[in-house]
Design a protein with these regions (language model features):
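Aromatic "clamp/platform" in nucleotide-sugar-dependent glycosyltransferases that forms part
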Residues: 348
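A charged, aromatic-enriched C-terminal amphipathic alpha-helix characteristic of glycosyltransferases
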Residues: 405-439
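A conserved catalytic-core segment of Leloir-type glycosyltransferases
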Residues: 3, 30-33, 37-133, 305, ...
Length: 446
């Protein structure tokens, strides 16, 4: 039995239903099972106050970080004028900027001021909670808060803290980061290469990329769910969900359980719903989040163009049950998933695929786009789902109709999928790998 450790999680936020926050909660569950104590450093937090250390500037959408990112990744005069309008107090930061590849000295100065401030806060965090190890959740992976990433790198270099860097989304995986004026910072800190860091990635492609690009080895730990504890049966509260989501008794509930962002490929779900030719309604469970509303407008227009009934139900699908200000019942995804006739997952890019595992956990039939990680890591396991390659074909429609019209066979395949996921993506697997990582961090036997 390894001794209890005090472990600090660091990220830009631990709140809501984004993938990083969800996976952090799962890691915390396992670590606490192993008798470790967990604490949180971030810019936004919904964890208990007594274990949290919140620094607003650590959030990647803090106004000052927003201004830095506009200069770093959106170096056009249009973006600069927009930045002046949104943040007039930072007008001086933009005066000498003329190319996305050149960084104004004023921006460099402000990055380092924030880096120093955030590093001091990291020291306070470590001392306040008497931390023994750190787990960095994506803050040293995707360069959305450059000062925080630099602060983390310097803190580790100065202290030699045992660190697990849990990577979700690398800069090289996102087009928006290709042209920038912060290549020196990305090379230094996203990800950093330091001897006390153990790197963890979600999939085999990332493991290959981080080795070739950063020269570091990594352990693969995919997303997980608690497949050792099957979902409970529906209770009376959940039974009204279909009606509250606007479905009539004869309609099929097609669930798109993701945020409304472009890489989720929601147009494919709308097209599928239209071309199936059956009474059906597409329910999108999450809002656009903090990545803008342009794509959401596009989805509204596309659904209207194809005359598809789409319900945008983020208002009544949340983290916990409750009531909206208007008096509507709020349901969890656990209330909605078991009542879905079909789950769509048409993403074009994913680090792994939380929604895929959720659909398997709730034993729902699933339509999946062959995104790269699915093709490389998930598909070879032998899951039985409807697949398509970038567009909805007649074969996709035929297979989907067959799934909907043959519930007994679908139930058998769902059980098969559940058992596969239990083998490869369970909390038991996560517990074993975290035990190995922590033992390595502290020089112990796993």
């Amino acid at each position: 039995m390894t001794p209890s450790r005090r472990i600090g999680f660091i990220s830009t936020r631990f709140a809501g239903t984004d993938g990083v926050s969800l996976e952090t909660a799962k890691w915390t569950t396992i670590l606490e099972r192993l008798d470790h104590k967990c604490f949180y450093f971030c810019g936004q937090c919904d964890r208990p106050e007594e274990v949290s250390y919140v620094v607003p500037e650590a959030f990647y959408r803090h106004p000052e970080i927003d201004v830095i990112n506009k200069v770093a990744y959106q170096g056009t005069w249009g973006s600069l004028h927009e930045g002046r309008t949104l943040h007039p107090e930072t007008h001086e930061l933009h005066q000498d900027f003329f190319s996305v590849f050149l960084r104004p000295a004023t921006i460099t100065k402000r990055i380092h001021e924030l880096r120093f401030y955030l590093k001091e806060e990291l020291y306070k965090f470590a001392h306040k909670f008497k931390l023994e190890a750190l787990i960095i959740e994506n803050a040293s992976t995707i360069p959305l808060n450059i000062p925080l990433g630099l602060a983390i790198t310097e803190f580790i270099a100065e202290t030699g803290f045992p660190v697990i860097a849990h990577h979700h989304d690398f800069a090289w995986e996102r087009q928006r980061f290709m042209n920038n004026s912060v290549r020196d910072y990305i090379a230094m800190a996203f990800p950093p290469s330091l001897p006390s860091i153990r790197h963890v990635v979600l999939n085999s492609i990332q493991a290959h990329d981080i080795a070739s690009r950063a020269g570091v080895t990594s352990m693969i730990i995919p997303n997980v769910m608690d497949f050792d504890s099957p979902p409970p049966p529906l209770d009376d509260y959940a039974l009204s969900a279909r009606a509250d989501l606007g479905l009539t008794p004869e309609q099929k509930l097609i669930l798109q359980p993701t945020r409304i962002i472009q890489r989720k490929g929601i147009e494919h779900a709308i097209e599928l719903t239209r071309r199936l030719g059956i009474p059906a309604e597409l329910v999108i469970s999450h809002a656009a989040g903090d990545e803008g509303t342009d794509y959401e407008k596009r989805i509204h227009e596309f659904a209207s163009f194809l005359n598809v009934e789409v319900n945008f139900e983020a208002a009544i699908v949340g983290d916990a049950r409750g009531v909206t200000p208007e008096g509507r019942k709020i349901y969890t995804l656990g209330d909605v998933y078991p009542q879905a006739d079909l789950v769509t997952y048409p993403s074009t890019i994913e680090g792994f695929g939380n929604a895929f595992l959720e659909a398997i956990y709730y034993k729902r039939p699933l339509v999946v786009n062959n995104y790269s990680i699915y093709e490389a890591d998930i598909k070879p396991k032998g899951f039985k789902v409807v697949e398509f390659d970038g567009y909805i074909s007649e074969r996709t429609l035929e297979e989907t109709r067959f799934v909907l019209n043959n519930p007994e066979l679908t139930a058998e395949e769902s059980e098969h999928n559940y058992e596969l996921a239990k083998r490869y993506y369970s909390f038991t697997m996560l517990e074993k790998r975290l035990a190995v990582l922590l033992a390595d961090c502290f020089g112990e036997m796993a």
